[in-house]
Curated annotation (Swiss-Prot):
It holds the Pfam family Metallophos. One of its GO terms (molecular function) is hydrolase activity. Belongs to the UPF0046 family. PANTHER family: METALLOPHOSPHOESTERASE, UPF0046 PROTEIN C25E10.12. It comes from the Eukaryota. This is UPF0046 protein C25E10.12. InterPro entries: Calcineurin-like_Pesterase, Calcineurin-like_PHP_ApaH, Metallo-depent_PP-like, UPF0046_metallophosphoest.
């Protein structure tokens, strides 16, 4: 882990105020146009295809998912972690041709969190939903939970944590969720999380707790101050599908469903040059 430790922001529990402070400090969030989905695939570049928040609608989206070398799904592929939903998703993602298919859980993958403390889910009335260790049914993809994966010499890390109470993988804003982000290693190429970082793809008009911004300040600071990946891919917020940049990292909200869980958006693609000495063979 890098020596550049990230500290909890005193305003992390107030995302709107926190982001206003960051803007005054000169933090950058610039929208950029996604690559065209019909862009040719090159032998000297790794093509990533990004999707998230398919919410039991992957079968509707399959015909529109372009080919590529690495497919990544940033969580919420089910609605409640039901065993039938997981089996269905596994079959559907298995039908795609991508050589590497990498998946993380989202808050809707109930039961996927090992050793989950259930009090929040009980309060939300969700404690009877989901199946423990249902991720073991994902035989057609690589499931990451606070783990790394390497494809074509490129390092990818996946983490499912978020700050929405009542669901699996919930951690409070501040030190508790920062503890999880501290596990992300430096020198990775692609970071996958379910929740967005503060200020990038996190506009949520339906969030009743945090107003219109629900991204994580500790995640943003981890990305910008310590990890500095080339790409950060996430979902969770359905209203802000798209691509932004801070000038160093490209941020991708790859959520494909709208707030009514209707398939509404296209996958997003990007390329990373093959590292020296690496091939796709």
């Amino acid at each position: 882990m890098s020596d550049n430790y990230v500290l909890v922001d005193p305003l992390s529990s107030k995302p709107i105020d926190c982001w206003k402070k960051y803007v005054k400090q000169g933090r950058v969030c610039e929208p950029i146009k996604p690559m065209r989905l019909d862009t040719p695939i090159f032998e000297n570049k790794v093509r990533f295809v990004c999707i998230s928040d398919t919410h039991e609608k992957l079968h509707e989206i399959l015909p529109y998912i372009p080919d590529g070398d690495v497919l990544i799904h940033s969580g919420d592929f089910t609605n409640c972690g039901d065993i039938g939903e997981v089996i269905k998703f596994n079959a559907e993602i298995g039908s795609l041709p991508h050589k590497h298919k990498i998946v993380i859980a989202g808050n809707h993958e109930l039961g996927f969190e090992d050793g989950e403390e259930m009090s929040e889910r009980q309060l939300a009335g969700l404690n009877m939903l989901g199946i423990n260790k249902a991720y073991e049914l994902l035989s057609n993809c690589t499931y990451l939970c606070d783990k790394s994966y390497e494809a074509y010499g490129l390092k990818i890390y996946g983490a499912p944590w978020h700050s929405m109470p009542g669901y699996s993988f919930f951690r409070q804003r501040g030190q508790k969720i920062l503890h999880k982000w501290n596990q992300i290693p430096a020198k990775i190429d692609v970071l996958m999380t379910h929740t967005p970082p503060l200020g990038h793809g996190d506009f949520n008009a339906w969030d009743k707790m945090d107003g219109i911004l629900c991204g994580c300040a500790e995640l943003l600071n981890t990305v910008e101050q310590r990890v500095k990946p080339k790409y950060h891919v996430f979902g969770h917020v359905h209203q802000k599908h798209g691509v932004t940049t801070n000038g160093e990292t490209t941020f991708i909200n790859a959520a494909l469903c709208d707030h009514k869980l209707r398939s509404a958006y296209d996958p997003i693609i990007f390329d990373i040059p093959l590292p020296p000495g690496k091939t796709k063979q």
